[in-house]
Amino acid sequence: MDAVLYSVPLSFTPLRASSSPSSPYLLLPRFLSVQPCHKFTFSRSFPSKSRIPSASSAAGSTLMTNSSSPRSGVYTVGEFMTKKEDLHVVKPTTTVDEALELLVENRITGFPVIDEDWKLVGLVSDYDLLALDSISGSGRTENSMFPEVDSTWKTFNAVQKLLSKTNGKLVGDLMTPAPLVVEEKTNLEDAAKILLETKYRRLPVVDSDGKLVGIITRGNVVRAALQIKRSGDRNA
């Protein structure tokens, strides 16, 4: 297994800070406090010739990113994120039924929640909207992608009952406030480590004012890894 070395500490920042010792916005999870020069395994099949290219090798690459500037040898979140123009977002005042319809129509599993000025105020997922933790026993686990066969029908009936109780409920009542965020300049390796090794499926990308500018997902990371590998193969 080959590995990529990164020397930039994580750039994650909470959306808000609080002076309260019990505030969930004051301290980040311990795994985010990474020291420089830790090793991050990007992919099991990531060959040595496909390491993140230096500035010289990347100059002739046809790697497709969001940036048209010359390669610096370090990939950032901003180059591979989904930009806000392509995102589906909701507001705290969006009804749960409206949000669920958008989820189904667009085949997605969650939304960033923004205010009138595009400031990020939370995240909401399909599980939040349906309160599925209340019918799943021990709650959602990322490792169990498919439900037990004998529980499927019971779960379906429970979802139907939950849908009958969503009238009048708003996204703001169910969203996760002040989620973990990254910036466009955050090292892609740092974001990938969080997305691939934890429960997080998506990380909102915000500017210095806390306004949403994009989102980086597990799918974005996998796509980036494939593009980097192909670029390395061409330059080998």
Curated annotation (Swiss-Prot):
Source superkingdom: Eukaryota
Classification of source organism: Eukaryota, Viridiplantae, Streptophyta, Embryophyta, Tracheophyta
Principal location: plastid
Keyword Aminoacyl-tRNA synthetase in annotation: no
GO biological process: cell redox homeostasis
Alphabetical list of InterPro entries matching this protein: CBS_dom, CBS_dom_sf, CBS_domain-containing
Localization of this protein: Plastid, Chloroplast
Protein name in UniProt: CBS domain-containing protein CBSX1, chloroplastic
Modification type N-acetylserine: residues: 54
Region feature (Disordered): 47-66
Range annotated as the organelle transit peptide: 1-53
A GO CC term attached to the entry: chloroplast
Alphabetically ordered keywords of this record: Acetylation, CBS domain, Chloroplast, Plastid, Repeat, Transit peptide
Presence of the UniProt keyword Thylakoid in the record: no
Gene name as annotated: CBSX1
Residue ranges of domain CBS in the record: 81-142, 175-231
